Amino acid sequence: EFLMEWLPKQCNKHKWAPCTYQSNLGTVQNLIIPYIGDMQMQKLKPYHLEDLYATLGKTPCGQYYEGKKQVLSEKQQQRLLSGTTIHEVHRLLRTAFQYAVEWGILVKSPVPVDSPKKSTQERSIWDVGEMQAALASMEDPILHLAVHLTLVGALREGEVAGLTPEDIDFDAADGMGTFTINKSMQRIQKASLAKTGKDCILREFEDKREGSNTVLVLKKTKTASSCRTIFMTEALKNELKHWFKRLEMDEAVDPERYRNSGMLLRLPNGLAVEPVLIRKKFEKWQDAHPAFPHIVFHGLRHSSATYQLMISGGDVKAVQGTTGHASANLLVNTYAHIQQDSRKKLGKKFEEGFYKPGATPVQAAPVEAEPT
């Protein structure tokens, strides 16, 4: 009860975006209340929360949705909550109970001092050869353009879906061409939108589905650094020019029934291509091409950023300008991994530079006898 009262107050105080409120609400409804929701706050002890973290570590993703227990398939039951998710539960509880102490509801916070460790497994990415081969094999024009834009600009899926024709400038940068990232598309809960207000919302799309509790929106980017200009490649520039011709042809087929959404990525009837459709198209392509390492669509952003760091010689600030990370440190920490091929090359360069021909051979240090 306390958490459900605390959330809206925090939302109003900190001007949360709808997606932030929705994410935190989901954490409370699905990862906290089902397990300790019946306990009195005053009786909560650190070991109760340690038990919660341990239980969550054995819990499948999606076990609860909107507070209701879900029936999961055998395959779904094998995908457990990550350490990062459990860490977020701890972070939310720590903040909430700090307020409970400040408001005089509790004398002391029951949240353990030590937080659960975040997941540290490396992200699955493609190397440059896999990126090139995958793009060449994609026949769906919507998917091809979405992936091409994502690889060139290291985009988030909401950013690629949020592009409009006005964001494309073929003459910029002395004819090189650019596209601008300044908004993002997302489907959010109507209830979350009602709680947070519409300050960050640029546009709501019409939804013909009756009784839907979600709405597709175009919103401001995540942070100021997320607004950025990306330089085109010649291949992408040519594809975009052909795409604009395709949009004109689609509208000419039946102008009266064509519903121009105003977005760059559109279905043949003019409606916007939302992020979930891009993900589904990518998943369908992956199922049909099992030879490629399996990655999520967001993995294309990581693949692109990793490759750009490699070819730039580690120019973090230049790559940050493309990826839109909030800070250089965040970029470095996110992409601290390096591909095996690059590590081999680095080892070879070290060997060639350190053991130069004619240099004094490196001798092993003599082993001294231990004192008696």
Model regions: which residues?
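Catalytic-site neighborhood detector that most strongly recognizes the C-terminal catalytic loop/helix
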Residues: 117-118, 125, 176, 183-187, ...
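C-terminal secondary-structure termini that scaffold catalytic or DNA-interacting sites
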Residues: 167-173, 183-227, 236, 269, ...
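Conserved hydrophobic/aromatic pocket- or pore-lining residues that grip, position, or stack substrates
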Residues: 32, 49, 93-96, 104, ...
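Short, basic (Lys/Arg/His-rich) helix/loop patches that form interaction surfaces
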Residues: 61-65, 136, 140-141, 153, ...
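Phosphate-coordinating loops and pocket residues in cytosolic domains that bind phosphorylated ligands
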Residues: 4, 43-46, 58, 107, ...
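Proline-centered turn/helix-capping motifs that create local helix->coil transitions or kinks
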Residues: 100-110, 170-173, 187-193, 242-256, ...
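Basic, Lys/Arg- and aromatic-enriched nucleic-acid-binding interface segment
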Residues: 62-83, 87-91, 102-163, 173-176, ...
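Short, Lys/Arg-enriched alpha-helical recognition elements, typified by the DNA-recognition helix
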Residues: 1-101, 261-264, 279, 283
